[in-house]
Curated annotation (Swiss-Prot):
One family name in Pfam for this protein: Cyanate_lyase
Enzymatic class: lyase
Disulfide bonds: none
GO function terms (MF aspect): cyanate hydratase activity; DNA binding
InterPro entries membership: Cyanase, Cyanate_lyase_C, Cyanate_lyase_C_sf, CYNS_N, Lambda_DNA-bd_dom_sf
Annotated organism of origin: Marinomonas sp. (strain MWYL1)
Highest taxon in the source lineage: Bacteria
Active site, per annotation: 87, 90, 113
Function: Catalyzes the reaction of cyanate with bicarbonate to produce ammonia and carbon dioxide.
Keyword terms: Lyase
Enzyme Commission numbers on file: 4.2.1.104
Annotated protein name in UniProt: Cyanate hydratase
Length: 146
């Protein structure tokens, strides 16, 4: 069984049981964003989380070890075609240099970690149209001189 097999099984079960990512996350004690990423194969589960996920979804036993495998974090380098993903790509394209300038002005020369990192998605109801709130929280890592 490979990561893609587990991902496809999870999507099939999620659809069959009419589950949300939030319900799956609650069942295993993680956040919806993190568990979704793990189910898509971009993060590895601890043994405890993998066991809970396999049990909750009724996945085959061999899925546990696959969920615990360290992923190769790679993705298609082509410009995304999905409209939602493309808009995030567009945000980074338009505001990336701005964010870099502001972050480095506040923190110095370095980067925001995507390893020591968390992310949250919230919904804000608004009479002019509901708003998506993305919160990214990454540790600042200064570049070292030697």
């Amino acid at each position: 069984m490979k990561k893609i097999d587990v991902t496809e099984a999870i999507f099939a079960i999620k659809k069959e049981k009419n589950l949300t990512w939030e319900a799956i996350a609650d069942a295993v004690g993680m956040t919806d964003v993190w568990i979704t990423s793990a189910c898509l194969g971009m993060n590895s589960c601890t043994e405890e989380v993998a066991e809970k996920l396999v049990a909750f979804l009724g996945l085959p036993a061999e899925a546990k070890s696959v969920l615990m495998e360290y992923p190769t974090k790679t993705w298609d380098e082509a410009i995304p075609q999905d409209p939602l993903i493309y808009r995030l790509y567009e945000v980074v394209g338009v505001y990336g240099p701005t964010l870099k300038e502001v972050i480095q002005e506040k923190f110095g020369d370095g980067i925001m970690s995507a390893i020591d990192f968390s992310m949250k998605v919230d919904k804000e109801e608004n009479p002019k149209g509901d708003r998506v709130i993305l919160t990214m929280n990454g540790k600042f890592l200064p570049y070292k001189s030697w």
